[in-house]
Each structure stands twice: as structure tokens, then as C-alpha cells.
């Protein structure tokens, strides 16, 4: 038994294994990749679109671009637990259908806005209505066999990260060819294809018996968890991971500017640095997931956090751009399987009937880290210097590894005594 598995069955009558889980995984992989590409391709030209909508002045353009981009994450963090709860009650496939259809409409309308306020409003609506990738994570986590959940979530995570990597590249190439507004319309069309694939190809397991559903209505999702301590610890770990990862993002370009002598190469090297971490994570996600299925998901979490903390220390003292690229790639390899392992630990420790609800909480916690990380990272980098961000983040990850190691050991003792 792995360290992440509860001694009790989370459900006394767990639903049978879904024979379509591999096909569902393939559709979720393709759908998550395509929707993430469509959502992130606006990054290279968002400031240009804001300027086209009438905003003038460099500071105002940067500010409105940040507001428009962050609005989606803010809204998504608010509603992720709600969609998870509704998915537990009415079906997780339905949540994917809702997300893909809503995102297709909102993304297409984004190409028709006439003011920056309309742009921000639609970006909020995308966050409220969207969540295809997070919904896919919940569906795969709940319907893949528990013994293969780490591998399946690693494959899905690789697709999501690949979408984040490819989206900005496509976004840099399309607007000069077809225009910014047409690019949004094309993105809406791509998401609509994901909607069609979801409707016709995903097969969900039957819903739980009526008595189990009624019990879920009487008791809150959190109240049904037999042992809340590992779940609470992993929720905090997911937030810590995103906080630590995103705290580096605001300073990468400025830091690279101190390492590269030619100003014309700063943007290129910064892009390579960011892509290196993503590429490493893509390559390692499914492999770390498969390893976690064998040795325990919590074990991999502790090890990956410790390795990442060690790799952050030399990043504070690099003297050339290639050194930073190499270290970020290695860090991506270490962190690639962490979020799938976080999801798997939750999956193994909550009842099937409330899994979506708790995984929705996990996604919200990660969004909080994703928003707070850049704010604190930028503040520390601006007031205490760039190396302080790397060293401070290393300390956070080391503390996270130590805390998870202690909690894992205590959890194993409780399992042995049960």
C-alpha cells in the first residue's frame, strides 16, 4: 500500500472501473491541449489589442493588460469548488461540456469587443464559464483506476503544459497573418471542436446510487472525508507549489538582463529560460506519475520538493544565461509530476462522491498561489534583489518538503496501527 492510500475504502460501494477511461484520457488530453493553446495565444499580442481598443500611454497599457489577463484566474479561483461540487452531483462530463461551450462563445466574442471594459468583462466570463483543463483533471482523477492514476494524470498534465508552451508561439505568428480579431475567432472555433469531441466521445461512469447522493446532500463534502489531515496538507502543498513557481516569473526577464550583455537578446533568452522549465516538466510528468504509482505519490512529492529547493539555490548565483536555462530545465524535470501527485493523493483519500468538490478546492488553492506568487516575487525582487527571490523560494520549498515528510511518516504510522 502506498503512503497516499487510506486504510479504509473511501466509499463502501465504489463505482466499477470505467472501461472507457483510456479514451476519456485521450479526449481530455487533446481537449485540454487545444483549449489551453486557445487561451494562452493572446499573451504576445494582448498589450497590442488593449492599445487598439483606445488605451494610451505605456503604463496604462501595461496595467490594463495585467487586469485583463489576471481577471480570468481571479474568476476561476472563485468558482472552481462550485463546478467541482456540481460535477459530483450532475456529472463531470456535463461540466466539460459547459466549460468548452462557454469558453468558445466568450473567446469568439472577445474578438468583437469595442472597449477595454468589454475585454475585461469577457475575460472574467471566460474564468467563470471555463475550466476545461481543471475539469479534465477531476474527471481523469475520478475515473482512471487508482493504480494508474499517477500515470494518467501525468499524461494529462503534459498536455496542459504543452498547451501553455505552444499557445504563445502560435499567438506570436497568427496576428500578422490574419489579424488580432480573427485570431480570437479562430481560437473560439478550436475550443468549439473540443466541445464537439467532449459531447460525442467521452463516456462517463453511471452516477452513484441515490442513497449515496442523498447522503452527500445531508453532509458537506469536507465532512465526509475520513481523515482530513493528509487532504489539508496536500491542499496547502498545491498552493505552495504554484506560489513558489510563479514567484519567479516576474523577475525572469529582469534577471536575464543582468546576465546577457546584448540587450537585443534579453527577450529571446528569457523566452528560452521560461520554455526550458516547461519542456522539462512535459518530459517528466508521465514518468514521475508512473514512478509515483509504484513507490507512492506522497513519496514523490517529498522528493521532488527537496530536489527543486536544491536546484533553486545555484540559480541565485548564475553568471550566464545558459546556466540559468540548464538549471530551469532540471527544475522542470523535478516539478513535472508534482501536481498530478497532489491530485492523486487527494483522490486516494476522499470518497468518490465528493472527489470533484475537494479537487475543486485544490484547484482554487493553486489559483491563489498563482496570483499571490508573482505579487510577492515582484515585491521581493524589487526591494531585496533578484537572488533573494530564488533563495526565499528555495527555503519555502525546503520547508514544504520537510513538512510533507513528517506528515507522510505520521500517516504511515496511523495506517500501520489501523
Label each residue range with its predicted role:
Residues 7-22, 204-235, 418:
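Juxtamembrane intracellular "pre-TM" segments in multi-pass secondary transporters
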Residues 45-62, 251-268:
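Short amphipathic helix-loop junctions that connect adjacent transmembrane helices
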Residues 67-83, 275-287:
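Central cavity-lining transmembrane alpha-helices of secondary-active solute carriers
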Residues 77-114, 292-298:
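Conserved MFS/SLC helix-loop-helix module at the cytosolic interface between two early adjacent transmembrane helices
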Residues 106, 117-125, 311, 322-330:
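Paired small-residue
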Residues 122-161, 344-345:
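Cytoplasmic helix-loop-helix junction between adjacent transmembrane helices
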Residues 182-200, 390-406:
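Symmetry-related core transmembrane helices of the 12-TM Major Facilitator Superfamily/SLC fold
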Amino acid at each position: 500500500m502506498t503512503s497516499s492510500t487510506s486504510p479504509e475504502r473511501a466509499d463502501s460501494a465504489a463505482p466499477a472501473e470505467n472501461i472507457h477511461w483510456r479514451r476519456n484520457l485521450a479526449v481530455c488530453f487533446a481537449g485540454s491541449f487545444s483549449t489551453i493553446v486557445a487561451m494562452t495565444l493572446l499573451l504576445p499580442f494582448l498589450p497590442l489589442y488593449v492599445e487598439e481598443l483606445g488605451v494610451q500611454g505605456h503604463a496604462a497599457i501595461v496595467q490594463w493588460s495585467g487586469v485583463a489577463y489576471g481577471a480570468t484566474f481571479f474568476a476561476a479561483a472563485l468558482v472552481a469548488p462550485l463546478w467541482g461540487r456540481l460535477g459530483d452531483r450532475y456529472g463531470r462530463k456535463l461540466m466539460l461540456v459547459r466549460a468548452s461551450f462557454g469558453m468558445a462563445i466568450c473567446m469568439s466574442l472577445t474578438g468583437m469587443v469595442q472597449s477595454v471594459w468589454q475585454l475585461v468583462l469577457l475575460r472574467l466570463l471566460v474564468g467563470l464559464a471555463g475550466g476545461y483543463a481543471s475539469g479534465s483533471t477531476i474527471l481523469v482523477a475520478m475515473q482512471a483506476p487508482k493504480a494508474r492514476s499517477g500515470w494518467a494524470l501525468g499524461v494529462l498534465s503534459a498536455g496542459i503544459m504543452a498547451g501553455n508552451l505552444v499557445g504563445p508561439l502560435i499567438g506570436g505568428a497568427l496576428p500578422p497573418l490574419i489579424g488580432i480579431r480573427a485570431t480570437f475567432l479562430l481560437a473560439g472555433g478550436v475550443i468549439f471542436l473540443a466541445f464537439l469531441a467532449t459531447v460525442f466521445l467521452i463516456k462517463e461512469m453511471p452516477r452513484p446510487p441515490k442513497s449515496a447522493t442523498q447522503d452527500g446532500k445531508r453532509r458537506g463534502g469536507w465532512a465526509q472525508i475520513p481523515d482530513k489531515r493528509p487532504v489539508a496538507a496536500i491542499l496547502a502543498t498545491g498552493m505552495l507549489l504554484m506560489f513558489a513557481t510563479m514567484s519567479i516569473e516576474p523577475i525572469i526577464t529582469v534577471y536575464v538582463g543582468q546576465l546577457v550583455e546584448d540587450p537585443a537578446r534579453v527577450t529571446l533568452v528569457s523566452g528560452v529560460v521560461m520554455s526550458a522549465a516547461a519542456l522539462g516538466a512535459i518530459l517528466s510528468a508521465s514518468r514521475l506519475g508512473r514512478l509515483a504509482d509504484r513507490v507512492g505519490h506522497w513519496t514523490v512529492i517529498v522528493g521532488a520538493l527537496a530536489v527543486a529547493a536544491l536546484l533553486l539555490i545555484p540559480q541565485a548565483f548564475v553568471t550566464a544565461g545558459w546556466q540559468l536555462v540548464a538549471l530551469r530545465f532540471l527544475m522542470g524535470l523535478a516539478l513535472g509530476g508534482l501536481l498530478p501527485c497532489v491530485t492523486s493523493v487527494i483522490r486516494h483519500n476522499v470518497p468518490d462522491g465528493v472527489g470533484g468538490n475537494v479537487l475543486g478546492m485544490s484547484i482554487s488553492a493553486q489559483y491563489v498561489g498563482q496570483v499571490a506568487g508573482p505579487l510577492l516575487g515582484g515585491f521581493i525582487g524589487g526591494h531585496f534583489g533578484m537572488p533573494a527571490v530564488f533563495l526565499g523560494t528555495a527555503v519555502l520549498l525546503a520547508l514544504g518538503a520537510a513538512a510533507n515528510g513528517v506528515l507522510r511518516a505520521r500517516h504511515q504510522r496511523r495506517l500501520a496501527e489501523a
